[in-house]
Regions:
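Conserved non-catalytic scaffold segment of RNase H-like nuclease domains
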Residues: 1-108
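A short, structured active-site edge motif that brings together acidic residues
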Residues: 107-117
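Conserved small/polar residues in nucleotide/adenosyl-binding loops
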Residues: 120-126
Length: 127
């Protein structure tokens, strides 16, 4: 089973980033079983650059719940699955840190789509 994941984060210092949006698609190898997405209040200001990049403003997040509210749901979605995503090591690190702040230990195998695309370009014939 696979959990395709994409996080948007607040930006800022390394290991201080907070999740502002979570999107997860659960795939069993044949079909999508479940999808989930939500905005998250990071309780810190989102960098201006991130606001421009994502279109998510601080005002959009003020009334949202914090990650702690979503932690168990997110864990239930991703546990015992391989995490897949674009630059997934970043998302994995941030997710792991957020779960740790909720006193939840989490480990997973990962597949990075950047590496997969690079490999595909090397192995597929060109026209």
């Amino acid at each position: 089973m696979y959990a395709f994941i994409d996080l948007e984060t607040s930006g800022g210092k390394f290991n201080k980033e907070k999740i502002i949006e979570i999107a997860i698609i659960i795939y069993n190898g044949k079909k999508i079983i479940e999808s989930y997405s939500t905005l998250v209040n990071p309780c810190i200001k989102v960098d201006f650059y991130v606001q421009k990049l994502t279109g998510i403003k601080n005002s959009d997040l003020e009334k949202e719940n914090t990650f702690n509210h979503y932690a168990k749901k997110v864990l239930n979605l991703v546990k015992d699955k391989i995490l897949v995503g674009h630059n997934v090591e970043y998302d994995y690190r941030v997710l792991k840190n957020e779960l740790k702040s909720c006193k939840i230990n989490y480990n997973s195998k990962t597949i990075c789509t950047i590496e997969t695309v690079s490999y595909t370009h090397l192995t597929l014939p060109t026209r």
